């Protein structure tokens, strides 16, 4: 996979460069033409700062051993329960995490394992807090298999605002627990499907930190 360790996610560079260039241009026009460019220049400066903040890519310290499942996303737990995962048609323990525009949007591998399958589904753009988003929204999923042979599914779900999913991983890749593997732009949701028997360690409404918050222990 590509290098994903830059302090600002590389997907943010074009946005940052564009807003910064607009800020500089408007400031220069205001200086030399003595026109009212202060307000738009300030607006683009604020957009530049927010975009840097949005695409921040901090280091994380991953706890536990290889049976410890860590959160793949920063955000808030909005669903817990047993469900049938539609791609594999298997029954899993599902945890859904909602990412607001203020969360870090870089996604991390919840376990160490091999990507044995990947899928992309076009779809709608419901608000990701609506449970229909898990089944009907645009999404990118990975099926991971651990060294012990356990399988789980992690799905990036696009939302009402977030309509650009980035996934660096592909079938055949090996992921390390806590390693960055993708992101979703501007507010989104991530669904993780864990094997039955996993001991779940989070509750509804709990805040999560990608790569650090323990979601559960594999059976």
Swiss-Prot record:
Q: Provide the active-site residues from the annotation.
A: 188
User: What reactions does this protein catalyze?
Assistant: a 1,2-diacyl-sn-glycero-3-phospho-L-serine + H(+) = a 1,2-diacyl-sn-glycero-3-phosphoethanolamine + CO2
Q: What is its EC number?
A: 4.1.1.65
Residues with Pyruvic acid (Ser) modification: 188
- Localization per record: Cell membrane
Top-level EC class as recorded in UniProt: lyase
Q: Where is this site: Cleavage (non-hydrolytic)?
A: 187-188
Free-text cofactor note = Binds 1 pyruvoyl group covalently per subunit.
What are the annotated GO cellular component locations? Answer: plasma membrane
The way it spans or sits in the membrane comes to: Peripheral membrane protein
Family matches, as Pfam families: PS_Dcarbxylase (PF02666)
- Which GO terms of type biological process are on file? phosphatidylethanolamine biosynthetic process
Modification(s) after translation: Is synthesized initially as an inactive proenzyme. Formation of the active enzyme involves a self-maturation process in which the active site pyruvoyl group is generated from an internal serine residue via an autocatalytic post-translational modification. Two non-identical subunits are generated from the proenzyme in this reaction, and the pyruvate is formed at the N-terminus of the alpha chain, which is derived from the carboxyl end of the proenzyme.
Which GO MF terms are attached to this record?
Answer: phosphatidylserine decarboxylase activity
What InterPro entries does the record tag this protein with? PS_Dcarbxylase, PSD-A
Ordered alphabetically, the record's keywords are:
Cell membrane, Decarboxylase, Lipid biosynthesis, Lipid metabolism, Lyase, Membrane, Phospholipid biosynthesis, Phospholipid metabolism, Pyruvate, Zymogen
What does this protein need as cofactor?
pyruvate
Instruction: Tell me, in a sentence or two, what this protein's role is.
Output: Catalyzes the formation of phosphatidylethanolamine (PtdEtn) from phosphatidylserine (PtdSer).
Question: Quaternary form?
Answer: Heterodimer of a large membrane-associated beta subunit and a small pyruvoyl-containing alpha subunit.
Give the family from UniProt.
Answer: Belongs to the phosphatidylserine decarboxylase family. PSD-A subfamily.
Q: What is this protein called?
A: Phosphatidylserine decarboxylase proenzyme
Name of the gene encoding the protein in the UniProt record:
psd
